């Protein structure tokens, strides 16, 4: 059984993480999704922070939805093996792809309890690269 101080700490830590995701979505100009691992086959979206700075790659917010976990996906690898990774997804609102970066979230004992996925459209990724090149030229 968990000590009440440890439990309080874990709850506060998860709340702080979830509270920070909307800010991260705007700064990253990407959808940021926190997935909770329900079982080895199911995940639930605890938080879906859609950016205000660009158009979301999802037509609707995914918060509260339950999905089957694809064990071979980047998300599956993060949740089941504890490894962060990158991959591509078909973008929901167009014919292009979205880029996904996933980090596992661990509890105080190091057990993977969820994952944070940052999902960026091809368009926004290209725009970021363009802004980065422009910034390098200004520094010369």
Predicted segment positions?
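Sequence-level detector for tyrosine residue identity
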Residues: 9, 34-35, 58, 108, ...
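Structured interaction and signal-relay segments at domain junctions
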Residues: 21-90
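Residue-identity detector for glutamine
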Residues: 14, 42, 50, 97-100
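PAS-family sensory modules
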Residues: 1-23, 28, 121-140
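Sensory/regulatory domains in signal-transduction proteins
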Residues: 69-135
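Short, compositionally biased low-complexity segments
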Residues: 1, 46-51, 113, 117
């Amino acid at each position: 059984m968990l000590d009440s101080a440890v439990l309080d700490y874990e709850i506060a830590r998860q709340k702080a993480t979830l509270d920070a995701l909307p800010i991260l979505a705007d700064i990253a100009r990407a959808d940021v999704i926190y997935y909770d691992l329900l079982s080895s086959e199911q995940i639930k979206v605890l938080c879906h922070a859609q950016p205000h700075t660009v158009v979301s790659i999802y037509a609707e917010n995914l918060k509260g939805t339950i999905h089957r976990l694809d064990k071979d996906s980047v998300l599956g690898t993060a949740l089941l093996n504890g490894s962060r990774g990158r991959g591509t997804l078909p973008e929901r609102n167009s014919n292009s792809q979205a880029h996904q970066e996933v980090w596992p979230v661990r509890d105080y004992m190091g057990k993977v309890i969820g994952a944070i996925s940052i999902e960026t459209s091809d368009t926004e990724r290209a725009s970021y690269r363009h802004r980065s090149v422009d910034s390098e030229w200004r520094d010369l």
